[in-house]
Amino acid sequence: MICNVILRKSGENNYGGRPYSYETDLELKVGDIVVCPTVSGLNYGKVVRVDVPREEIDPRWRGSLREIVDFAPEG
């Protein structure tokens, strides 16, 4: 499944910016907080859309989507 997440802002406890697409085998729902790989290392992301059709992903990125690591720990 492909989902869209917005990333946690550096040093803050809120999420924003443009959505990024990730692949996952996890059963996610909108609002879940997950651990995502980014160019700067791991970060938390908030799921804003699930079941994104592959056709909606820019063809340049379809074969290189990163995968969500896991659910974020609670707390």
Residue positions per predicted region:
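Terminal, basic amphipathic appendages of nucleotide-handling enzymes
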Residues: 2-75
